[in-house]
């Protein structure tokens, strides 16, 4: 990538993305995040919020279970998203998965996300990006679609380039040797 291409790419990122981090050394709560996101919606017209990773947020446990806290947090975020017309994405990692008999890990789904079935129950769309380290292919598994006009459950495979960190379609391979068999 040339210097000009890099500068153009960085300009595009700065025009289309806002990175909100806790620079004061504290851990953000969901209320902190939604307050700052509300300001970004009104000042800059933000339409998408990605919380990555969710497990870096502070949750005031008190006497509630983690399951109840997550359920309440997801309800709060869902209500905020509807009020502000914003799509919200959570990057959430699964609880510990165990290898299957073939040596591979299962594809995590919504119920595998740590601490609560609410991740599955309250999501409008849920999907998993699952990398196969043997083939360097990535499987996108859509495990939930609440509203059918948004899509359907299924799986698609992509090629992953470790060097560039990019995904691409897997090219069709034409076997010209089929006549010689």
Where are these regions (language model features)?
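Hydrophobic/aromatic beta-strand patches that form the interior of the parallel beta-sheet core
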Residues: 18-20, 89, 125-127
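C-terminal regions of RecA-like/P-loop NTPase motor modules
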Residues: 8-12, 30-46, 79-84, 96-181
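Conserved inter-motif catalytic segment of the P-loop NTP-binding fold
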Residues: 1-63
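Short acidic, glycine/proline-rich loop/turn micro-motifs
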Residues: 59-64, 100-104
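Active-site-proximal loop/turn and secondary-structure-junction residues that shape catalytic pockets
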Residues: 55, 94-95
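Hydrophobic alpha-helical membrane-association signature
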Residues: 33, 69-73
């Amino acid at each position: 990538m040339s210097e000009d291409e890099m500068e153009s790419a960085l300009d595009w990122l700065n025009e289309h993305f806002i990175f909100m981090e806790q620079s004061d050394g504290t851990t953000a709560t969901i209320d902190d995040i939604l307050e700052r996101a509300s300001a970004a919606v009104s000042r800059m017209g933000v339409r998408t919020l990605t919380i990555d990773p969710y497990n870096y947020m502070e949750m005031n446990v008190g006497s509630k279970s983690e399951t109840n806290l997550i359920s309440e947090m997801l309800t709060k975020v869902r209500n905020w998203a509807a009020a502000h017309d914003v799509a919200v994405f959570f990057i959430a990692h699964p609880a510990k998965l165990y290898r299957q008999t073939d040596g591979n890990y299962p594809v995590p789904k919504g119920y595998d996300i740590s601490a609560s079935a609410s991740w599955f129950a309250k999501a409008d769309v849920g999907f998993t990006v699952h990398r196969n380290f043997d083939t360097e292919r990535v499987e996108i598994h859509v495990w939930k679609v609440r509203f059918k006009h948004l899509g359907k459950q299924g799986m698609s495979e992509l090629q992953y380039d470790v060097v560039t960190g990019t995904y691409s379609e897997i090219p069709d391979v034409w076997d010209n040797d089929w006549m010689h068999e």
